[in-house]
């Protein structure tokens, strides 16, 4: 796990990447030097956010004609902010594949590496992706890849348990397979287009893969989402989605695209926002709202956790 000074350095680097316009739009703290230019920054922020559609109709500025079909690919990058250092992931844009896993903290104990199963899943999946010849019409099957990676981890009697998400771009289809509360979302024209649904047994108890006492790969959600050029895919562990709402994520993605941020810059900004939300008291988050709904708690704060964010631009 990274030492606290390293984490602070990472967050400082992320902080420098966040434009003041994004800070205003998202309610983040402005840098001290930005106060004098607040009015101008606010104006820029408003102009960058997506325009609302008229009630009962589509945006009149949208063209009715479909763009000509062409081969799609992804440009992807990631950001990882460790807490217990139990998340792991890989990004392989040349193969059109990104994946992440979150080791279940409930296995944390002396002599037990709670991250072991997650790391085994991602290592096995990555090795198979690297060994697979790219260019097949159907692309890589995320469900088959998850199943193979799981079987290898079970055969090795790997300790721990893990949630996981694997995404693969095949033509104009983003194929997916996931288990548990690690999730992904697709944004189109500055708006949420698709969001995966968390698989949980009960509050804070997600579906998970393990050698024993876990769920089977057959429990994984799988399918495909039709994507097009300009779409943005954001995948993350629960450290992201427990602390950032879909609406907040939508605004960050829209602002990032309007400001021309790269996938890496967007991933950094999203992770930085999630970290700030996870450490801020007196602020409702998806985690606190769900806890209030399911357990009757009254706290208003985020959830400290590893935060993994993968951002892919469809181009």
Curated annotation (Swiss-Prot):
It comes from the Eukaryota. Mn(2+) 2 binds at residues 102, 238, 305. Keywords: Hydrolase, Magnesium, Manganese, Metal-binding, Protein phosphatase. SMART domains: PP2C_SIG (SM00331), PP2Cc (SM00332). Its EC number is 3.1.3.16. Binds 2 magnesium or manganese ions per subunit. Its cofactor is Mg(2+); Mn(2+). Mn(2+) 1 binds at residues 102-103. It catalyses: O-phospho-L-seryl-[protein] + H2O = L-seryl-[protein] + phosphate; O-phospho-L-threonyl-[protein] + H2O = L-threonyl-[protein] + phosphate. Disulfide bonds: none annotated. GO terms for molecular function: metal ion binding; protein serine/threonine phosphatase activity. Residues 71-314 form the PPM-type phosphatase domain. Belongs to the PP2C family. PANTHER family: PROTEIN PHOSPHATASE 2C, PROTEIN PHOSPHATASE 2C 24-RELATED. This is Putative protein phosphatase 2C 24. It comes from Oryza sativa subsp. japonica.
């Amino acid at each position: 796990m990274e030492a606290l000074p390293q984490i602070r350095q990472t967050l400082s680097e992320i902080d420098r990447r966040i434009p003041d316009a994004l800070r205003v739009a998202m309610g983040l703290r402005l840098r001290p030097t930005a106060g004098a230019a607040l009015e101008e920054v606010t104006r820029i922020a408003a102009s960058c956010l997506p325009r609302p559609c008229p009630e009962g109709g589509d945006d009149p500025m949208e063209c009715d004609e479909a763009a000509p079909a062409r081969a799609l690919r992804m440009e992807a990058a990631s950001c990882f902010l460790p807490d217990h250092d139990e998340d792991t992931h890989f990004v392989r844009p040349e193969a059109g594949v990104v994946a992440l896993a979150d080791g279940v903290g409930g296995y944390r104990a002396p002599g037990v590496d709670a991250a072991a199963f997650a790391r085994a899943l991602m290592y096995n999946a990555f090795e198979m992706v690297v060994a697979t010849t790219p260019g097949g019409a159907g692309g890589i099957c995320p469900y088959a890849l998850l199943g193979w990676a799981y079987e290898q981890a079970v055969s090795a009697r790997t300790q721990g348990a893990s949630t996981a998400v694997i995404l693969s771009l095949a033509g104009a289809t983003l194929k997916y397979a996931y288990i548990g509360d690690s999730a992904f979302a697709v944004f189109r024209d500055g708006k949420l287009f698709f969001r995966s649904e968390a698989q949980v047994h009960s509050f804070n108890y997600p579906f998970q893969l393990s050698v024993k006492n876990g769920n089977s790969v057959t429990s994984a959600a799988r399918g495909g989402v039709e994507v097009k050029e300009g779409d943005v895919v954001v995948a993350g562990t629960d450290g992201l989605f427990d602390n950032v709402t879909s609406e907040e994520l939508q605004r960050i993605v829209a602002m990032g695209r309007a400001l021309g941020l790269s996938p890496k810059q967007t991933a950094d900004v999203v992770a930085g926002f999630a970290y700030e939300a996870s450490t801020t008291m007196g602020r409702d988050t998806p985690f606190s709202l769900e806890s209030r709904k399911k357990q009757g708690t009254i706290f208003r704060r985020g959830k400290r956790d590893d935060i993994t964010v993968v951002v892919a631009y469809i181009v």
